Amino acid sequence: ENFKIKHTEPGLLSMANAGKN
């Protein structure tokens, strides 16, 4: 999960985290 957060921006982190998870 850490590598995803580093690749995603703070704003996209919420959408990416909810979408991927």
From Swiss-Prot:
Keywords associated with the record: Isomerase, Rotamase
Chain positions covered by the region annotation Disordered: 1-21
Q: For this protein, what reaction is catalysed? A: [protein]-peptidylproline (omega=180) = [protein]-peptidylproline (omega=0)
Q: What InterPro entries does the database record attribute to this sequence?
A: Cyclophilin-like_dom_sf
Q: Does the keyword Transferase apply?
A: no
Q: What is its EC number?
A: 5.2.1.8
Q: Give the family, as the similarity comment puts it.
A: Belongs to the cyclophilin-type PPIase family. PPIase A subfamily.
Free-text function comment from the UniProt entry: PPIases accelerate the folding of proteins. It catalyzes the cis-trans isomerization of proline imidic peptide bonds in oligopeptides.
Q: What name is this protein filed under?
A: Peptidyl-prolyl cis-trans isomerase
The organism named in the record is Naegleria fowleri
What lineage, starting at the top, does this entry show?
Answer: Eukaryota, Discoba, Heterolobosea, Tetramitia, Eutetramitia
